[in-house]
Amino acid sequence: MQGTDNAPPGAQANKSSSPRRIRHVRRHYTSNDHRHTPSTAESNPVQRIRSGEECTVELSMSPGQPLVEEQPLVEERPPVEEQPLVEEQPLVEEQPLVEEQPLVEEQPLVEGQPLVEEQPLVEGQPPVEGQPLVEEQPLVEGQPLVEGQPLVEGQPLVEGQPLVGGQPLVGGQPLVEGQPLVEGQPPVKVQPLVEGQPLGNMVSLYDQLPRGSILSLQKGLTLAGVTTPVDMPPLAGVILLCAVLPLASVIPPASATPFAAVIPPAAVIPLPGFLPLGRLLHLADLLLRAGVLLLAGILPLAGAPPLAGVPPLAVALPLAGAPPLAGVPPLAGAPPLAGALPRAGVLRRAGVLRRAGVLRRAGVLRRAGVLRRAGVLRRAGVLRRAGVLRRAGVLRRAGVLRRADVLRRADVVLLAGVQQLADVQRLADVQRLADVQRLADVQRLADVQRLVCVTPLSVVSPLAAVIPAVAVIPVVAVIRVAAVIMLEKMQPQGSSPQLQMGCRRIRQRRSSPRTCQKLRQERDRAGISWREHVGRHMLCSSTRSRYCSHRLGAACRSHCRLRCGVLCLPHALTQPTRQERGVAEMMSTS
């Protein structure tokens, strides 16, 4: 089969003038086993498409090949060259560097955050994150840096001494630890103290003190119970008093001078109420300037707690212009101050040193990882502190538990003691019951003896023939028969229901004094005489079942107490209490 190549010319002209059109390729199956071989013009449909003519390509497909109908060509896709380039995207190289940011452990890097290089690094002090450096603050070894504390002009840099704002520096005045610097006051020449020199020869020190302070001091020492020799000045007494009294657990007042921080006034004079505080502080200042504190090298003040940040007196800075004391070692690593530095020199030297290398050193060390090390140390300290607190809490809980265990053990011991006492009490009660039983048996034998003695001969004579049989009868049976015979003769004709009700109450519960009074009133209403009452109780103790259910012993004894306050005949041999004897006397007289 061939395509339609011989089309009319008009139709070809119309189709050639129209835009390029591509007809879909039609394919169909042929029944022949061979494929159709087209001519050269037919075999190149691309040339026909370029020439503008319409062509239809018919291809023969073999059996079993899938049919793909109307598949368009992909020539209408625009070329990839028309895609714009991504040259307009800004480069990341223009992003500012974050080198100025300090390396803080666990802190994210924020873009644009400046590096804080103004914080000085003090040896032995952990750096604090985010704390700015104050240029006016001196660098003191071992002293924490307080943010915002200015450097006061004229203040000397003393190792370990806190900086107080507004304190002037006087040129030429020696720097004494703990001594306030007063502007315009000349330094006091101090007489050196030689070991072994008597204190009474210190006339110059005695003359330097004002007369009023000496008299007040002498009066205070006298009232405090400290007596000084006549030829010894009061200043020597103060020195001896400072050497003898321990200076411990004394808190100086907030408004006290630096002398009060070294030796509190309460330690110099035991009774500070005898001297005004202002005069006492003034006297302390004078004693400091006179060189009393230099005695610390000869007579150490035992027990004095050192002030926070202030070295002890034994290693104090030597005074300028005064020979060092014997036995006082100089401060290790601190040159003696020949004189006070001028104000301008102090400020210039401090500022130059601080600005020259502190900032660079701080930045280099911080970048090298000081803050990371500080964070590790801080975290280790927190863990140690948490462990100590946890261990302390566990110990406290363990102490509480141990204390609770001790209390429980004490309770158990007390309960055991009470139990033992109760057991002893029961044993004593059993012993008393046994004793009462023996006494009751003896009493019965005595009663039988009396009955035998008072029996008429007419009654005894018929029994003379049966004496062997009577001897065989048990003694207990004879006692019971005799008691029943005797008590039935004494028993009244009828029994009172009120008396029976009272006995029933006694069986049911323990009676109080109020119940005892009610029972006495019932006995009085029933009209029972004292003899009948005793007879009834004898019957109760002998038969054990007629008037009460109590057995013979302590129960019957308590029954007799509650009933009338007097023991019945079986218990007559026991020792009654004082109250029972009083009630018995009262009942016998009535």
UniProtKB/Swiss-Prot annotation:
The keyword Protease does not apply. Coiled coil: none annotated. Residues 348-413 are annotated as: 11 X 6 AA tandem repeats of approximate R-R-A-[GD]-V-[LV]. Residues 18-29 have a biased composition (Basic residues). Sequence repeats lie at residues 66-71, 72-77, 78-83, 84-89, 90-95, 96-101, 102-107, 108-113, 114-119, 120-125, 126-131, 132-137, 138-143, 144-149, 150-155, 156-161, 162-167, 168-173, 174-179, 180-185, 300-305, 306-311, 312-317, 318-323, 324-329, 330-335, 336-341, 342-347, 348-353, 354-359, 360-365, 366-371, 372-377, 378-383, 384-389, 390-395, 396-401, 402-407, 408-413, 419-424, 425-430, 431-436, 437-442, 443-448, 449-454. It comes from the Eukaryota. Residues 1-71 are annotated as: Disordered. Somatic ovarian tissue. Residues 419-454 are annotated as: 6 X 6 AA approximate tandem repeats of Q-[QR]-L-A-D-V. Keywords: Repeat. Residues 300-347 are annotated as: 8 X 6 AA approximate tandem repeats of P-L-A-[GV]-[AV]-[PL]. Residues 66-185 are annotated as: 20 X 6 AA tandem repeats of P-[LP]-V-[EG]-[EG]-[QR]. This is Ovarian abundant message protein. It comes from Ascaris suum.
